[in-house]
């Protein structure tokens, strides 16, 4: 409106001047008793111009259709763009196909191999009691739940599983999700919104990164597992910032980092959380059922009261030999997700037989705590056996079931590094029938930690399995990395 007013005024002034110019010659003109002035002349001219423009025929360029020969030439010359960009050699993934369950021993291409590439920490894949519970659930409920939890998808076994997990961890309530990685990237956006502040470890895995992105919050990263960096980041965000005191603030960390095998120092994180008045979201997919005297996770490992952690999430596929995930915490935290978490509201609920498997697995862990001792013994033995591996070094924590081997000397190129590591993994599988994997990352993954070889330890592995993978890695890495040692 402010810009249009001067234009209208200028137009009116021009018309007034033109009318005044015509008023003088026609000051005394009278036609059929009507006084003729400049306004009538100008308006008459405008009407004539409008009629002329409307009566003109629109311009149409002459039609010159293409001949059959020209059409054929154009078709021959046309080169369509590819539907997707070509895959570079470094991005190609030729994943071995398992032909049996992902137990400590599995089958690939008809040959039995030792499996260090699948997370089966408690060795429960193939457990007879868990299989029997699944069969009974299938006979009673069928395969699927046929709907989301809020729309005829809630089965009594879902409620039993939620109650079992909450009781096991000592929390007021818990909530089930139908897919492991969808748990964390649904929970984060359910609580964190645009304008909120999230401080996250730079080493979090892709599912956590996706949740951070979907939240649209302001995300600030601190150095991997560096509490001094976390303290400095929290200080900068809160010092003299009155606005920060009025908005929601979160710290997001993993208990055991999938990209490094390191364990987060929860006691120090809780101290900083209370000092700067942040909330903590803890992702426990690789520590639930593993850390702590009875497998209750990172809080039990550090002796931190579990109510000090605001939100805990975990996938159940790593320790419980099932699928799905859960979030646990206060009743208020859980109830909020039943209406606000996309992975819960808009996804079909966890198949009942998988919930039954989770209940049986937790019961097995409660009744057989010795399985944790077996797992820790295997991890310790593997660390000992892998010491002195040419060109590789262990960077993971001594209690982590993810034993992470990285290059002692990087080539300076992540693509070259991953090529070397994949060559090692391929030769170990081909020559010694030991299945291991390199930590290859998607182009969408923003984690910049060093790549490496991940060995997933299981309580079901034997000493001979561990000795074989160690000797194979030493022999093959000495050959592949001979120019880099």
Curated annotation (Swiss-Prot):
Transmembrane intervals: 32-52
Domain of life, per lineage: Eukaryota
Assembly description: Heterodimer with LCB2. Component of the serine palmitoyltransferase (SPT) complex, composed of LCB1 and LCB2.
Family: Belongs to the class-II pyridoxal-phosphate-dependent aminotransferase family.
Topology term for the membrane: Single-pass membrane protein
Protein name per Swiss-Prot or TrEMBL: Long chain base biosynthesis protein 1a
Example GO BP: sphingosine biosynthetic process
One cellular component (GO) term of this entry: endoplasmic reticulum
Annotated catalysed reactions: L-serine + hexadecanoyl-CoA + H(+) = 3-oxosphinganine + CO2 + CoA
């Amino acid at each position: 409106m402010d810009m249009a007013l001067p234009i209208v005024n200028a137009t009116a002034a021009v018309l007034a001047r033109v009318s005044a110019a015509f008023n003088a010659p026609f000051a005394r003109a009278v036609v059929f008793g009507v006084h003729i002035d400049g306004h009538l002349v100008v308006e008459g001219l405008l009407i004539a111009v409008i009629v002329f423009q409307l009566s003109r025929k629109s311009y149409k360029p002459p039609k010159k259709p293409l001949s059959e020969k020209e059409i054929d030439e154009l078709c021959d010359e046309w080169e369509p763009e590819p539907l997707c960009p070509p895959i570079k050699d470094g991005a190609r993934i030729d994943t071995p196909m398992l032909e049996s369950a992902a137990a400590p021993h599995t089958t690939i291409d008809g040959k039995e191999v030792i499996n260090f590439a699948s997370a089966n920490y408690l060795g429960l894949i193939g457990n007879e009691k868990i299989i029997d519970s699944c069969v009974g659930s299938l006979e009673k409920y069928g395969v699927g739940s046929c709907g989301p939890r809020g729309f005829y998808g809630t089965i009594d076994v879902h409620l039993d599983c939620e109650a079992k997990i909450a009781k096991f961890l000592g929390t007021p309530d818990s909530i089930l999700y139908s897919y492991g990685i969808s748990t964390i990237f649904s929970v984060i956006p359910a609580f964190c919104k645009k304008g909120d502040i999230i401080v996250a470890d730079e080493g979090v895995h892709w599912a956590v990164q996706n949740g951070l992105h979907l939240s649209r919050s302001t995300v600030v990263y601190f150095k991997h597992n560096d509490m001094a960096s976390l303290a400095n980041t929290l200080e900068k965000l809160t010092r003299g910032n009155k606005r920060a005191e009025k908005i929601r603030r979160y710290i997001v960390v993993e208990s055991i980092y999938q990209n490094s095998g390191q364990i987060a120092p929860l006691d120090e994180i809780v101290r900083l959380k209370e000092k700067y008045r942040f909330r903590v979201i803890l992702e426990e997919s690789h520590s639930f059922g593993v850390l702590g005297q009875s497998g209750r996770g990172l809080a039990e490992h550090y002796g931190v009261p579990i109510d000090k952690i605001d939100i805990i999430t975990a996938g159940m596929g790593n320790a419980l030999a099932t699928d799905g995930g859960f979030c646990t915490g206060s009743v208020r935290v859980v109830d909020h997700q039943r209406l606000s978490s996309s992975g819960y509201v808009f996804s079909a609920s966890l198949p009942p037989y998988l919930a039954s498997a989770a209940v049986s697995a937790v019961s097995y862990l409660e009744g057989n705590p010795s399985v944790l001792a077996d797992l820790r013994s295997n991890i310790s033995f593997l660390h000992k056996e892998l010491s002195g591996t040419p060109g590789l070094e262990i960077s993971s924590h001594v209690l982590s079931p993810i034993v992470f081997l990285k290059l002692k000397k990087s080539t300076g190129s992540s693509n070259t590094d991953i090529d070397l590591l994949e060559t090692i993994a391929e030769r170990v599988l081909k020559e010694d029938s030991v299945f291991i994997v390199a930590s290859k990352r998607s182009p969408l993954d923003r984690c910049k930690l060093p790549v490496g070889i991940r060995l997933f330890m299981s309580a079901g592995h034997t000493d001979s399995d561990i000795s074989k993978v160690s000797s194979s890695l030493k022999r093959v890495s000495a050959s592949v990395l001979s120019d880099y040692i």
